[in-house]
């Protein structure tokens, strides 16, 4: 019962924070931040779905290396084993897609800085294309799952005959596959973070002291990605907990509850990377309506005014010559 309450609270907080962040991105972003708002909206949408699936299943995971047992305790139990297995797989799928989108957002930031603003329809199209492999992968596992497959005797784990439990070869290999993919994708996020951080720093060095606002922009970007790189640590910790239980390094009594709870902190903490370090959103929250001095937004392209200034000076000189 306590575990279900904790899960309900975490899922509610995850949905609420990400829904609020989505609201800010959709309604409080200036025109220059439209690409950024689209990136944030897609990410928060994925976090919301992950939180909903976590609440739907409220799973515990037990393994001794030879088998993996998923014990759902959420609303999915009212719809049968197949619904719980689908919810279990979708939760892991959304967590993985969230990490993939983080990598994509780093690439988009590079593109925005050095090339131009990508159209929003292109961002949506890329997000859709990135989801196709995961959806095909999930559909394959769903087709293999047999809800009538018998599980081993679970009395040694303190699980009564009346409790729903998901087990068997499909559950075993699908869990192993997805958890391994989560670990690899989280590692790739760290690699992408190192790359984009070096890119932002080198961009600031190239600009030198010509544009002070550019330095402020890059400082904000670095703060955002410094916070975001902390998010995969929850995935790492959850996977390490699972691996430790899988290899019998730790007992299942507490580890079975820890894995899903640890995973949930990734979507919960994600909105704070924007709320804390993007001035426009932060000012909306604290009720600050005006900025004393305009600054370029963190996701907008850097525009140089040098050419415009030179044209204006040339035109003015021409008018003066005509007057004389």
UniProtKB/Swiss-Prot annotation:
<feature type="transmembrane region" description="Helical">
    <location>
        <begin position="83"/>
        <end position="103"/>
    </location>
</feature>
<feature type="transmembrane region" description="Helical">
    <location>
        <begin position="124"/>
        <end position="144"/>
    </location>
</feature>
<feature type="transmembrane region" description="Helical">
    <location>
        <begin position="258"/>
        <end position="278"/>
    </location>
</feature>
<feature type="region of interest" description="Disordered">
    <location>
        <begin position="290"/>
        <end position="324"/>
    </location>
</feature>
<feature type="compositionally biased region" description="Polar residues">
    <location>
        <begin position="303"/>
        <end position="324"/>
    </location>
</feature>
<feature type="transmembrane region" description="Helical">
    <location>
        <begin position="227"/>
        <end position="247"/>
    </location>
</feature>
<keyword id="KW-0812">Transmembrane</keyword>
<keyword id="KW-1133">Transmembrane helix</keyword>
<dbReference type="InterPro" id="IPR019421">
    <property type="entry name" value="7TM_GPCR_serpentine_rcpt_Srd"/>
</dbReference>
<keyword id="KW-0472">Membrane</keyword>
<protein>
    <recommendedName>
        <fullName>Serpentine receptor class delta-30</fullName>
    </recommendedName>
</protein>
<dbReference type="Pfam" id="PF10317">
    <property type="entry name" value="7TM_GPCR_Srd"/>
</dbReference>
<feature type="transmembrane region" description="Helical">
    <location>
        <begin position="38"/>
        <end position="58"/>
    </location>
</feature>
<feature type="transmembrane region" description="Helical">
    <location>
        <begin position="5"/>
        <end position="25"/>
    </location>
</feature>
<feature type="transmembrane region" description="Helical">
    <location>
        <begin position="176"/>
        <end position="196"/>
    </location>
</feature>
<dbReference type="GO" id="GO:0016020">
    <property type="term" value="C:membrane"/>
</dbReference>
<comment type="similarity">
    <text>Belongs to the nematode receptor-like protein srd family.</text>
</comment>
<dbReference type="InterPro" id="IPR050920">
    <property type="entry name" value="Nematode_rcpt-like_delta"/>
</dbReference>
